[in-house]
Amino acid sequence: MKLILFLSGLVSLVLCTLAAPTGDQKEIHTETPPPKKPSETTTPGALKTPQPEPKDEEPTPGAFQGDMMLTEDQQRESKEAIDDEMTGRKKRKATIYESQRWPYKVIPYVISPSSSGQSSLIRNAMDHWEQNTCLRFEPRTSSHSRQLGHNAYLSFFRGSGCWSYVGKAFNGEQQISIGNGCAYFGTIVHEIGHAIGFHHEQSRPDRDDYINVLYQNIQSGRQHNFAKYTWGRVTSRNVEYDVGSIMHYGGYGFSSNGRPTITTRDPRLNSRLGQRIALSPADIELANLIYECDDIEDCAGANECLNGGYHDTECNCVCPSGYNGDLCEDAVTTTRPDCSERFTEMTGVITSPNWPGRYEDNMACVYQIEGPPGSTIELTFTEMNIENHAACRYDAVEVRKDDINSDGEKFCGNTLPAVQISSGNQMLISFTSDPSITGRGFRATYRIVILTTTQIPDTTTISTTTPVPTTTQATTDETVVGSCGGSFGGTQGRVATPNYPNNYDNDLECVYVIEVEIGRRVELDFIDFVLEDETNCRWDSLSINLGDGIKIDMKMCGREYPAASLVSIGNNMELTLISDRSVTDRGFMADYRAIDL
């Protein structure tokens, strides 16, 4: 986490005090949660869905939260804090200190012979921090001790796993392990983040406003890795929580069953968890605040640099990645189309970026559809032209219709998928492309279906003297909720036109699909029926498919409808309502039930 720079007293679960530049501890104001911003936190680059689990989350023996080594003092304080949590004892008094920072913003380092093959990658990771902050990483020399007033330095070596101490923890060699499988740019940037004083982002006290921690999916004995701190013991410098921080856990860290251990409260942001591509703007802003990169006496009268920027020795603003302008006031714009959207309208159209033109390489788009509680969502693909692969491994559109936090079915090529129907009121569609070969993409329409399976008293009697069963309805004052089509099931229920008993809308095409248990049939009785009247039902009409392709050979409109019950041929029945551009009426209401024949 970028935030949590350790204190000199007890910190919730883990403590790591950082030393002030002068060597004196510097007390900071009491921390309060930063305000939540209306805009989304952004992370550089297109992120695939989901991110591969970061190597730094793989458990290292003796490490806390996978990749953080603790000093003896920190281990003792951590145990005391855990004991306090378990017993409910009042926390020991602690004051926020931003201590154990590296003095003068200079971090001496050595790269051991065991890591010589990784030296270019390690240097690139340090350059990334230098390019976006005022920190400087310098090869260790004999003069550093005299110039900086300490003997501390980072020592990169090829140890077991990926891990680092937090902040300036020793007055001597401080190791960072870049072991097997850890030699990736983002992983090394992450470990250096720990070394300069960052903790994991999901440890912040305000994390529950942004993420869900799913303890039921966490390995037994690993729950402490998901502990969070309190504002009385940590500081965020008022920088907003960032699910795209390079210091954030991925979605599946320490999973016991292959299911997520962390999800974002906004499902569209799940793909940002665990990114190891680059520092996020919020990472950069916090580092520059913590290390007081803008604290130059000669620039006291200069305008403040914004968005994590800081003044150089000439009092010009140095802007972090993603911003420019004299004061870093301008966000760098991109021509890449925005493709993270949330849909709540009852109907809509979703397309891949640039449709009907070709989508770009390296896209990662997330579309969330959410209806009212109790509703379902139907998604119909009308166009599909995506790079093909038997397992859709290259480019794909994925539909999550049951659990939006679990993998869904992937589609690619030119074959239109079947209609996708959600089991609840949410659906998540992601579209990803690799670095080569593109197509036109996809186009799909959706509709939110308000379920209208209001239960009615079972007062049906089947006559033994007639070939078609009839129904006698109970006289009730039930509330009827109409809809423009939908899927209906169960043993009995009710369907009605949109807005019933008020007039339905113009320009409708509503399809109602009623399906009961295999081996049974659907019986339908109209309670009310008033559509715009016309001799041949050319304007507004209702047609009925009794299943197995059998349709009634007439359209119904006006006030004319079958007086007897309609019975399906198979276990399903389909009703289609059509309205034109003018004149509407009350519509219809009908009850259905499953029967045995």
Swiss-Prot record:
One Gene Ontology cellular component: perinuclear region of cytoplasm
InterPro entries recorded: Astacin-like_dom, CUB_dom, EGF-like_dom, MetalloPept_cat_dom_sf, Peptidase_M12A, Peptidase_Metallo, SPAN/blastula_protease_10, Sperma_CUB_dom_sf
Region (Disordered): 24-67
Location of the EGF-like domain: 295-329
Peptidase M12A domain span: 93-294
Family matches, as Pfam families: Astacin, CUB
Annotated localization: Cytoplasm, Perinuclear region; Cytoplasm, Cell cortex; Secreted, Extracellular space
Disulfide bonds: 134-293, 162-182, 299-315, 305-317, 319-328, 339-365, 392-412, 484-510, 537-557
CUB domain ranges (all copies): 339-449, 484-595
Cofactor: Zn(2+)
SMART domains, per the entry: CUB, ZnMc
TM stretches of this protein: none
Record GO terms (molecular function): metalloendopeptidase activity; zinc ion binding
Keyword Metal-binding carried by entry: yes
GO biological process annotation, one example: proteolysis
PANTHER family in the cross-refs: DISCOIDIN, CUB, EGF, LAMININ , AND ZINC METALLOPROTEASE DOMAIN CONTAINING, METALLOENDOPEPTIDASE
Protein name per UniProt: Blastula protease 10
